[in-house]
């Protein structure tokens, strides 16, 4: 049963957004359009970002996210990854339900603590692995058999976003989440190599993940590429499935019946599913335990890719 914090008895949920960068702005827009939800406040250390958000939505805009504690029923945490654990923990303790952008945390122990806290406080905790909604549209997850092998590639030009963590935690973690949806077997070996050119962390990584049943997944991710590419290839005993997530093209030589990838709004679906779970008390499509599993594999890949050649840059302002 949902415990409303506003005491109004109207059923209107007060939503907050922490961080109004590229993702945070979209989260705010989604909440503003949902029935039964009031976008109440946003928090961002940038005065320019606060002014823009306040102008766009006519809401309270504060510099310190702590000012929102106890004043919202649910919140999207879209701040830099290194700040996720502290902010999520504070809002769970304040009684709010939380949707945190990936990764759930930057440490497995932190993720475990957040999952336990959400359960102890009877609060919903879910993670923004929106690619899952895109992938689910193909219908491939409806088939129980795992592929023999898998390849994933995700590359794009440098934008400066997500530079507080490696490209593995920033981008590859999407593909790791999809990988674990297709491969139920345990990971037994990880090998990787990476390089850094624009940040303190790996900006490009090649990785191979081997599973207990002998299957393998090969992954490539880059945030310093010249062109944008996103796709996957899954090989089965009766053929192969290749998906281009940029062109929305699906090539299928297997006996599985798949659906075309239509234009969609995965972030909107993610926010709407979160709100529905809060209102109805049900489960979210992305369980925090699944996000924790993707994080664990991501950290194994980070360790395997070290050392990477890195140069020291000026410290960037983080939302702490």
Located regions from the model:
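N-terminal Rossmann-like dinucleotide-binding module
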Residues: 1-57
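C-terminal helix-rich "cap/oligomerization" subdomain common to oxidoreductases
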Residues: 1-8, 74-77, 123, 212, ...
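Beta-loop-alpha module in the N-terminal Rossmann-like domain of NAD(P)-dependent dehydrogenases
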Residues: 27, 57-115
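Hydrophobic residues in well-ordered beta-strands that form the structural core
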Residues: 63, 100, 125-127, 243
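A contiguous active-site-proximal alpha/beta segment in oxidoreductase catalytic domains
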Residues: 105-162
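Mid-domain beta-loop-alpha active-site segment that forms a flexible
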Residues: 128-135, 158-187, 270, 291
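Contiguous beta-strand/loop segments that form the cofactor/metal-binding neighborhood of enzyme cores
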Residues: 173-247, 261, 268-283, 301, ...
């Amino acid at each position: 049963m949902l415990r409303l914090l506003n005491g109004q008895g109207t059923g209107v949920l007060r939503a907050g957004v922490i961080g109004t960068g590229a993702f945070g702005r979209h989260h705010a827009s989604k909440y503003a359009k949902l029935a039964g939800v009031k976008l109440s406040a946003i928090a961002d250390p940038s005065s320019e970002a606060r002014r823009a958000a306040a102008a766009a939505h006519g809401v309270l805009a504060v510099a310190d996210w702590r000012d929102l504690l106890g004043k919202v029923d649910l919140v999207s945490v879209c701040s830099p990854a290194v700040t996720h654990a502290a902010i999520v923990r504070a809002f769970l303790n304040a009684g709010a339900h939380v949707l945190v952008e990936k990764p759930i945390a930057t440490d497995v122990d932190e993720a475990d603590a957040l999952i336990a806290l959400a359960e102890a406080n009877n609060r919903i905790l879910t993670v923004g692995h929106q690619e899952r909604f895109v992938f689910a549209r193909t219908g491939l997850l409806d088939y129980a058999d795992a592929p023999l092998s898998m390849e994933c590639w995700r590359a794009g030009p440098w934008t400066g976003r997500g530079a507080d963590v490696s490209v593995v935690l920033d981008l590859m973690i999407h593909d790791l989440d999809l990988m674990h949806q297709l491969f139920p077997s345990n990971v037994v070996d990880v090998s990787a190599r990476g390089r850094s050119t624009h940040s303190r962390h790996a900006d490009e990584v090649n990785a191979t993940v081997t599973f207990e049943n002998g299957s393998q997944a090969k992954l490539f991710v880059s945030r310093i590429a010249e062109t944008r590419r996103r796709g996957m290839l899954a090989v089965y005993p009766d053929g192969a499935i290749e998906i281009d997530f940029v062109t929305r093209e699906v090539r299928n030589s297997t006996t599985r019946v798949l659906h075309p990838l239509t234009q969609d709004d995965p972030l909107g679906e993610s926010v709407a599913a979160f709100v529905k779970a809060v209102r109805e008390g049900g489960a979210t499509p992305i369980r925090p335990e699944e996000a924790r599993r993707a994080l664990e594999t991501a950290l194994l890949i980070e360790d395997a890719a070290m050392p990477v050649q890195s140069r020291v840059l000026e410290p960037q302002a983080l939302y702490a």
